[in-house]
């Protein structure tokens, strides 16, 4: 019997089989849990996430979500709720920064707008997703939210 037998949740941030989110999902599944996955919009991202998720379990369920869009986050959790009876955990493992400002010698020149966009995607989305996850978790007496820090 696994520690997570019967637990079902959403993992956000599986980009490939080297991402932290993928390794977390691997351990969840190894301990009896089930994972659904959210990925960045676009067919290329869907294929990449599907390839990684299929290494963990057959027929993974994927959802598309632009984490910078409150509407997309709402749709993500609405669609998840239609497909699953429960949400026991949310794994938030996403980050974003405009690569132009990650170049050597550019960091100190990062404009406020680019910095705030990085904070919105990398940090605020945890709050937005937690807000949408909470009512789904409450239906079964609560749940767990885990986020990667950067």
Map each language-model feature to its residues.
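Conserved Rossmann-fold cofactor-binding substructure of NAD(P)-dependent oxidoreductases
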Residues: 68-83
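Residues in the short beta-alpha loop(s) of Rossmann-like NAD(P)-binding domains
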Residues: 41-43
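SDR active-site strand-loop-helix element
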Residues: 12-14, 38, 93, 142-150
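Rossmann-fold scaffold of SDR-type NAD(P)-dependent oxidoreductases
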Residues: 64-65, 85-103, 122, 147
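Rossmann-fold cofactor-recognition segment
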Residues: 53-71
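Catalytic Tyr-X3-Lys loop
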Residues: 88, 106-128, 142, 146
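Amphipathic alpha-helical dimer-interface segment in Rossmann-like NAD(P)H-dependent oxidoreductases
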Residues: 78, 82, 95-96, 117-141
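Canonical Rossmann dinucleotide-binding motif of NAD(H)/NADP(H)-dependent dehydrogenases/reductases
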Residues: 2-38
């Amino acid at each position: 019997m696994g520690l997570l037998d019967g637990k079902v949740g959403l993992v956000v941030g599986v980009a490939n089989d080297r991402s932290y989110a993928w390794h977390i999902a691997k351990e969840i599944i190894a301990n009896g849990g089930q994972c659904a996955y959210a990925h960045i919009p676009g067919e290329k991202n869907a294929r990449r996430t599907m390839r990684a998720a299929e290494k963990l379990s057959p027929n993974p369920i994927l959802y598309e979500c632009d984490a910078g869009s409150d509407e997309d986050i709402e749709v993500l959790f609405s669609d998840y709720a239609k497909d699953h009876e429960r949400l026991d955990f949310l794994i938030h493992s996403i980050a974003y920064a405009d690569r132009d400002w990650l170049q050597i010698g550019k960091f100190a020149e990062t404009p406020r707008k680019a910095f705030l966009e990085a904070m919105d995607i990398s940090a605020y989305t945890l709050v937005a997703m937690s807000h949408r996850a909470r009512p789904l978790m409450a239906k079964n007496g609560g749940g767990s939210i885990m986020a990667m820090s950067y």
